[in-house]
Amino acid sequence: VAKCTEESGGKYFVFCCYKPTRICYMNEQKCESTCIGK
């Protein structure tokens, strides 16, 4: 599964990337339910 990073408050967090739109989900549970190719 592709990953992406997003900056928040000067800190970097890793989120799921939902293909093919590569949207960063801030909610980890949402990542788990939406990521393709887990």
From Swiss-Prot:
Keywords: Antibiotic, Antimicrobial, Disulfide bond, Fungicide. It comes from Taraxacum officinale (Common dandelion). It comes from the Eukaryota. Expressed in flowers but not in leaves, seeds or roots (at protein level). One of its GO terms (biological process) is killing of cells of another organism. Coiled coil: none annotated. The keyword Transmembrane helix does not apply. Disulfide bonds. This is Antimicrobial peptide 1. The keyword RNA-binding does not apply. Antimicrobial peptide. Active against fungal species B.cinerea (IC(50)=5.8 uM) and A.niger (IC(50)=5.6 uM) but not against F.oxysporum, F.graminearum, B.sorokinina and P.debaryanum at concentrations below 10 uM. Active against bacterial species P.syringae, B.subtilis and X.campestris.
